[in-house]
Amino acid sequence: MPMYQVKSYHGGSAPLRVELPTCMYRLPNVHSKTTSPATDAGHVQETSEPSLQALESRQDDILKRLYELKAAVDGLSKMIHTPDADLDVTNILQADEPVPLTTNALDLNLVLGKDYGALKDIVINANPASPPISLLVLHRLLCERYRVLSTVHTHSSVKNVPENLLKCFGEQARKQSRHEYQLGFTLIWKNVPKTQMKFSVQTMCPIEGEGNIARFLFSLFGQKHSAVNLTLIDSWVDIAMFQLKEGSSKERAAVFRSMNSALGKSPWLVGNELTVADVVLWSVLQQTGDGSGVAPANVQRWLKSCENLVPFSTALQLLK
């Protein structure tokens, strides 16, 4: 006999029926237009709305394009970082041969703009204590290409200018009227910390530094180079102005080794044609005096090749 007797809660002799759940959590059907909860496991509709299908299609297209872009980037990365890459720099160098300096003159209007009859005048301020030899070489090269009106002036900030610098452009006798010249080249000896150049006094700020001015002047020759050669030329100009001219003895020795290696492969520093890199490096070597008896064999041969050209030999006379 039980200690406690409890009445049945399911009602008499009726069988006990318990409805067991078919899922742990019952949620409303998100695809249904009604808010009533789903009553069975097959609440997901087999067909979705057109807008949802369009969204899924766009997502697939975007993912496909991203995968293609990633594959292209991976291929470029492998090409750059792998030593045996498919990109052959030698073919690029051979495909883009530089235009020699003996070709026809460049249309200055394309580089300097139209002045509607006015003479295009390049004005350079330079300190006679440190004459920019490379600019004098480039001036002579420009005279071989264009009809250049050359003038030399002395600023009041300078007391004494050597006679050879006053006559660095030769005799100043004008043989033609001003409008018959293609280019004006005015050199002003002035007490300035760095060599300065202005082409359009009203519209441009001055270009400072012998290397930067040499780059600008050499662009007037219209020489074409590949991207690789242009990078090498700019690198040599920077090396000349910062390491060779202002660096320590160890830095200058490293420059000589690099020059000797490059000149062992070609007659000039970059390829088979004279570039602004040769002009600037030769000028710095003359200013520092490092080219006399210290340079390696290939550099000595290159120095003689430079001095065999009239623009270089004429500028060299100014240092004596």
Swiss-Prot record:
Region (Interaction with TP53): 162-225
GST C-terminal domain boundaries: 220-317
GO terms for biological process, alphabetical: apoptotic process; negative regulation of cell population proliferation; positive regulation of protein ubiquitination; protein ubiquitination; protein-containing complex assembly; translation; type II pneumocyte differentiation
Keywords assigned: Apoptosis, Cytoplasm, Developmental protein, Differentiation, Nucleus, Phosphoprotein, Protein biosynthesis, Ubl conjugation
CDD domains, alphabetized: GST_C_AIMP2
PTM: Phosphorylated on serine residues in response to UV irradiation. Ubiquitinated by PRKN, leading to its degradation by the proteasome.
Keyword Translocase: no
GO MF annotation terms: molecular adaptor activity
Domain of life assignment: Eukaryota
Residues carrying Phosphoserine: 36
GO cellular component, one term: aminoacyl-tRNA synthetase multienzyme complex
Cell compartments where the protein resides: Cytoplasm, Cytosol; Nucleus
Gene3D superfamilies per the UniProt record, alphabetical: 1.20.1050.130
Chain segments carrying region Disordered: 31-52
Region Interaction with PRKN: start-end pairs: 82-162
InterPro entries found in the cross-reference section: AIMP2, AIMP2_LysRS-bd, AIMP2_thioredoxin, Glutathione-S-Trfase_C_sf, GST_C
Complexes and interactors: Part of the multisynthetase complex (MSC), a multisubunit complex that groups tRNA ligases for Arg (RARS1), Asp (DARS1), Gln (QARS1), Ile (IARS1), Leu (LARS1), Lys (KARS1), Met (MARS1) the bifunctional ligase for Glu and Pro (EPRS1) and the auxiliary subunits AIMP1/p43, AIMP2/p38 and EEF1E1/p18. Interacts (via N-terminus) with KARS1. Interacts with EPRS1. Forms a linear complex that contains MARS1, EEF1E1, EPRS1 and AIMP2 that is at the core of the multisubunit complex. Binds FUBP1 (via C-terminus).
Function according to Swiss-Prot or TrEMBL: Required for assembly and stability of the aminoacyl-tRNA synthase complex. Mediates ubiquitination and degradation of FUBP1, a transcriptional activator of MYC, leading to MYC down-regulation which is required for aveolar type II cell differentiation. Blocks MDM2-mediated ubiquitination and degradation of p53/TP53. Functions as a proapoptotic factor.
Name this protein carries in UniProt: Aminoacyl tRNA synthase complex-interacting multifunctional protein 2
Organism: Cricetulus griseus
